[in-house]
Amino acid sequence: FKRAVEGQHNYLCAGRNDCIIDKIRRKNCPACRVRKCLQAGMNLGARKSKKPGKLKGVNEDSTPTKEGGQTCPGSGGGYLSSGEKELSTSPTNALVPHGPGGGLVTPYLPPSICSVLELIEPEVVFAGYDNTQPDTTDHLLSSLNQLAGKQMIRVVKWAKVLPGFRGLPIEDQITLIQYSWMCLSSFSLSWRSYKHTNGQMLYFAPDLVFNEDRMQQSAMYDLCLGMRQVSQEFVRLQLTYQEFLSMKVLLLLSTVPKEGLKNQAAFEEMRVNYIKELRRSVGKAPTTLDRRGNRSSQLTKLLDAMHDLGGELLDFCFYTFRESQALKVEFPEMLVEIISDQIPKVESGNTHTLYFHKK
């Protein structure tokens, strides 16, 4: 575990990152074994503590329920409360150390953070698209919404083990995920499209790829062109996997409430750390690519452009959500919870995007 996290070994799974790891088969796949260690809460910080038995999770002061679980104070029903509960009750502490007294230490990044980002990157999700039905607008959009709901589950799990993220208050964690989910989804889509179709089609899932016909039939052709253009920019830049992973985290950390977060200082420190990680990733890129300074500028401009595209995608999402009955477009319960809570905040101008370059 120590060698993998510190980057001495970069393990890769020969399967689909879902190998069974138990007492007998623990040596079959080192990559899945390390992933399971991270999900179970192993971290380098705990090894340095003189009293490992007193290491506490974020939620240890929470009130137990009758079922033996734990709940967060003031949490309600639905996705946001369940997401908050999932973030707060998971044993995983995302490599954020706790002091002997149980208090959180300031968020930090362990050595070779890219090794950790590679290990926790979610697996590709299948849409379960019904190819026996015609590619009608409502069928395509409903399928995309169902896929987005599945992906959101992975986003929450990814955030739980993201180095530094668990050091933020639960309210801040939920807010950042809620404000960035569309950008994260479209950015990951662009990466898959870049790797699997060389930027020619939109690779939403292995069983749901948009060609030109599906783009036009989806009723969001211009938005599809925008997402494909991002993927083609990946092709032009020959974006590396390490750069993509660092940029993805920065998208999570780039939209905040206008009044700020509960712990704005911890958030800003975490964001600065990941900006440094992006610069390190650029420094590792092949020397045949653009000059380092110019490349960093190009990547941050691309991140800024993602916010503009994400805003347009949200507008379309909000429209189809409001007109879902008339358009016969279905939304999974998770997206209903997120969008219902997000619409008033976005449309009231309560969000603030952190751009790298002046608009």
Curated annotation (Swiss-Prot):
Major location category of this protein: cytoplasm
Region of interest called Hinge, as start-end residue ranges on this chain: 50-107
Region (Important for coactivator binding): 157-160
NR LBD domain span: 108-339
GO function terms (MF aspect): 11-deoxycorticosterone binding; 11-deoxycortisol binding; 11beta-hydroxyprogesterone binding; 17alpha-hydroxyprogesterone binding; 21-deoxycortisol binding; core promoter sequence-specific DNA binding; corticosterone binding; cortisol binding
The UniProt record lists the keyword Nucleus: yes
Alphabetical list of PROSITE patterns matching this protein: NR_LBD, NUCLEAR_REC_DBD_2
Note on domains (UniProt): Composed of three domains: a modulating N-terminal domain, a DNA-binding domain and a C-terminal ligand-binding domain.
Designated name of the protein: Mineralocorticoid receptor
